[in-house]
UniProtKB/Swiss-Prot annotation:
Superkingdom: Bacteria
Coiled coil: none
InterPro entries (alphabetical): Enolpyruvate_Tfrase_dom, Enolpyruvate_Tfrase_sf, MurA_subfamily, RNA3'P_cycl/enolpyr_Trfase_a/b, UDP_GlcNAc_COvinyl_MurA
High-level lineage: Bacteria, Pseudomonadati, Pseudomonadota, Gammaproteobacteria, Alteromonadales
Residues that hold phosphoenolpyruvate according to the record: 22-23
GO biological process, one term: cell division
Gene label: murA
UniProt cross-references to CDD domains, sorted A to Z: UdpNAET
Pathway: Cell wall biogenesis; peptidoglycan biosynthesis
Function field: Cell wall formation. Adds enolpyruvyl to UDP-N-acetylglucosamine.
Catalyzed reactions: phosphoenolpyruvate + UDP-N-acetyl-alpha-D-glucosamine = UDP-N-acetyl-3-O-(1-carboxyvinyl)-alpha-D-glucosamine + phosphate
Modification 2-(S-cysteinyl)pyruvic acid O-phosphothioketal, positions: 117
Record-listed UDP-N-acetyl-alpha-D-glucosamine binding positions: 93, 306, 328
Protein name according to UniProt: UDP-N-acetylglucosamine 1-carboxyvinyltransferase
Length: 419
């Protein structure tokens, strides 16, 4: 398996171009089976999870062709299967997002229960119960969700018990071809949900109020083709900004969206950074050792859970002591034992971690456990004295496009070693 070798101690400096958002690209790719004509997507990140999603569409009979510059053309008119097999779904929890659109388009769907990062239960009950309210008959047997509906799905009022991004997206995609009006209450408000709604509307859907906690969808008979550009990745942006501050550097992120990062930017300023921003760029300037900052993760527009591990690495070398409380996922502190191997003074119990900043980290062999934990270990390696070896980086390849090349462009001493 590939690994990273990092020799830390160099401040990051320069500009980096941000890729398309993984968490927007995946649902948009799944939604690409809904229209009756070809679509072309641009700013699609080159990631393992994107490749898996395209493989999944292939399994459904949907053909695609990769164009230049992170673009892909998808032809949903060749859809001729309705089963998402375990071999593909086991590697990626987002595979559950095929359930709603596949059921809406074909009237039946068989989707294996999902896999992906080992960071908690992430139950699919919300998806199933919502689709049942829309008239679907659903059984869960032999590890598969087996869904069917006679005729079209029916519009319904759906109250989500907990805020769920994928639950909101799955039901939104199902509702665009349903008969009548669907209302999703307690909906997720993440920017990626808005991007999915904008994509669907560009194809002729009628989705309103995405970005609020109540989304209204009026079903249409069919969707047409079109072209769409995936939004920039706010988590990749945040990761580079944290890396810049942790190393005492100065970095400008290009082709990003500052409006989607308010909570993160406020915490970076609280940690001592100077932030400048324009319509599609963010620049960060460090001023000595960062200050430790308290973090509480919560659904958007609060602090995103996908940035928690990176700030844990930042707090590990910051001045002072700060707490981190994780309210979204259980079991999301798996990076902490690895950071301790590098000399971090971080303790955790339940969903809370306490970070006591140390003067320096030292290089060590560490192991990735999930996508965002991987990013925290890379940041720690960039700061540490000596050499850090980061193992099992297939986790980071799931969500960061060419991260080592982008870091090299900012002056980092990092290399990918192929086993």
């Amino acid at each position: 398996m590939d690994k990273f070798k990092i020799r830390g101690g160099q401040p990051l400096s320069g500009s980096v171009t941000i890729s398309g958002a993984k968490n927007a690209a995946l649902p948009i790719l799944m939604a690409s089976l809904l229209p009756s004509e070809k679509i072309t997507l641009s700013n699609v990140p080159d990631l393992h999870d994107v490749d898996t999603t395209l493989e999944l569409l292939d399994c459904l009979g949907i053909s695609h062709s990769n164009l230049n510059n992170n673009s892909v053309c998808i032809d949903p008119t060749t859809l001729n299967h309705f089963k998402a097999p375990y071999d593909l779904v086991k590697t990626m929890r987002a595979s559950i997002l095929v359930l709603g659109p596949l059921l809406a388009k074909t009237g039946k769907a068989e989707v294996s229960l999902p896999g992906g990062c080992a960071i908690g239960a992430r139950p699919v009950n919300l998806h199933i119960e919502g689709l049942r309210k829309m008239g679907a008959h659903i059984d869960v047997e032999n590890g598969y969700i087996k869904a069917s509906v006679e005729g079209r799905l029916q519009g319904a009022e759906i109250l989500l018990d907990t805020v769920s991004v994928t639950g909101t997206e799955n039901l939104m995609m199902a509702a665009v071809l349903a008969e009548g009006e669907t209302v999703i209450e307690n909906a997720a408000r993440e920017p990626e949900v808005i991007d999915l709604a904008n994509f669907l509307n560009s194809l002729g859907a009628n989705v309103r109020d995405a970005g609020s906690d109540t989304i209204h969808i009026t079903g249409v008979n069919k969707l047409h083709g079109g072209e769409y550009s995936v939004m920039p990745d706010r988590i990749e942006t945040g990761t580079f900004l944290v890396a810049a501050l942790a190393t005492g550097g100065s970095v400008r992120c290009e082709k990003t969206d500052p409006a989607s990062l308010d909570a993160v930017l406020k915490k970076l300023e609280e940690a001592g950074a100077t932030i400048d921003k324009g319509d599609n760029w963010i620049a960060i300037q460090s001023h000595g050792r960062p200050k430790a900052v308290n973090i509480i993760t919560a659904p958007h527009p609060a602090f995103p859970t996908d940035m928690q591990a990176q700030f844990c690495a930042l707090n590990a070398i910051a001045e002072g002591t700060a707490g981190i409380r994780e309210t979204i996922f259980e079991n999301r502190f798996m990076h902490i034992p690895e950071l301790r191997r590098m000399g971090a003074n971080v303790e955790s119990e339940g969903n809370t971690a306490l970070c006591h900043g140390v003067d320096e980290l030292t290089g060590a062999e560490v192991m990735c456990t999930d996508l965002r934990a991987s990013a925290s270990l890379v940041i720690a390696g960039l700061v540490a004295t000596g050499e850090t070896v980061v193992e099992r980086i297939y986790h980071i390849d799931r969500g960061y496009e060419g991260i080592e090349k982008k870091l090299q462009g900012l002056g980092a001493d990092i290399e990918r070693v192929t086993a």
